[in-house]
Amino acid sequence: MSTVIKRPTRACVIGHVKIGGDAPVVVQSMTNTDTADYLATALQTAELARAGSELVRITVNSPEAAAAVPKIREHLDRMNCNVPLIGDFHYNGHRLLTEHPACAEALAKYRINPGNVGFGKKKDEQFAQMVELACKYDKPVRIGVNWGSLDQELLARVMDENSRRAEPLDATEMMRHAMVTSALESAAKAEEVGLASEKIILSCKVSSVQDLIAIYRDLSQRANYALHLGLTEAGMGSKGIVASTAALSVLLQEGIGDTIRVSLTPEPGGSRSQEVIVAQEILQTMGLRAFTPMVAACPGCGRTTSTFFQELAGEVQDFVRAKMPEWKLRYDGAENMTLAVMGCIVNGPGESKHANIGISLPGTGEAPSAPVYEDGEKTVTLKGDNIANEFKQIIERYVERTYTKKLKS
């Protein structure tokens, strides 16, 4: 695993999930269903949890949504899905939590946006009201600052202060400073109201990679609250994945961050679970967590004119991901297994020997056989039309004999 030294933050418990302190970085996701449709929201929440999301955030934006929250929690419990629910509030959270105590109780954490919790004279009053409710129900709070909804009064104030500096900050520096100031001042206000410091999580989300890195570096140096990382509005497909990975990996490598979310825009009709898989793969690729066996595969070249190795790599990845829930219940350590599916003799045997299990498929003009290596030793050579199924059986047998069986409770 990684030698990254995590920066010390205050430990916080969200439902049954510990974040901060000495806890590993936790994966979070968010539903995109209408929360008032409690069944659809419960089903998508369960889907995200099955994919590996350890915390799930849901929008609570109306009386109907607030009334649905306890039903969602109840339905999840009946499905044996104990993932903690986070309520995402904007504008009217103070009223919804007051008028719907069952919602306030069913949620494991509240998200408050200091930029729109209230305006003018009502801002501090409504912020304090939400914090008091968090204290009443013993819930942690994420103070989530977002550049798109930054507190305009605060922004005007810090801009005025900046104009009087001997060396004023430029526009980018001002934006970063305002984001951090909003988060820290809001946290201080929450503590003044009575919320314990270990009940506070901070986030400052922007859509620029460099801005996100600079903001969180500053934030982590100025306070030790638990931090939630995420690049807001990362985008679709490879752009969203690359942008989120570029931002989060730098911060995680520096030991910054206690929870992460990859905010991908899904394809129409696409699975919301993709954001969970990407978050897990970021953490596992960096050696910070282990969730499922990693499959190494070569990119292919002129020596690999057959597409079979590509098809097999995808099939093996799908196989181990599908088997992992069962393996997780039965065995300790299977998530650390490494696999290699290689396409020719150049790097195939070498990469295969370095994995726990590897297969080197024949390239163009090579003998039609595929040697299999287990822990560096060649164990069998596969031939014929059933290589995929035989290789998956080898993986299954390896798991059964290699990893310690868990005792039944």
Swiss-Prot record:
The EC number on file is 1.17.7.3
Q: Which cofactor does it need?
A: [4Fe-4S] cluster
Write one Gene Ontology MF term. 4-hydroxy-3-methylbut-2-en-1-yl diphosphate synthase activity (ferredoxin)
Q: Please indicate which superkingdom the organism of origin belongs to.
A: Bacteria
Q: Pfam family of this protein, just one?
A: GcpE
Q: Which UniProt keywords apply?
A: 4Fe-4S, Iron, Iron-sulfur, Isoprene biosynthesis, Metal-binding, Oxidoreductase
Reaction equations catalysed: (2E)-4-hydroxy-3-methylbut-2-enyl diphosphate + oxidized [flavodoxin] + H2O + 2 H(+) = 2-C-methyl-D-erythritol 2,4-cyclic diphosphate + reduced [flavodoxin]
Pathway listed for it is: Isoprenoid biosynthesis; isopentenyl diphosphate biosynthesis via DXP pathway; isopentenyl diphosphate from 1-deoxy-D-xylulose 5-phosphate: step 5/6
The keyword 4Fe-4S is assigned to this record: yes
Q: Which family does it belong to?
A: Belongs to the IspG family.
- Record function comment: Converts 2C-methyl-D-erythritol 2,4-cyclodiphosphate (ME-2,4cPP) into 1-hydroxy-2-methyl-2-(E)-butenyl 4-diphosphate.
Q: What is this protein called?
A: 4-hydroxy-3-methylbut-2-en-1-yl diphosphate synthase (flavodoxin)
Annotated organism of origin = Dechloromonas aromatica (strain RCB)
* Source lineage: Bacteria, Pseudomonadati, Pseudomonadota, Betaproteobacteria, Rhodocyclales
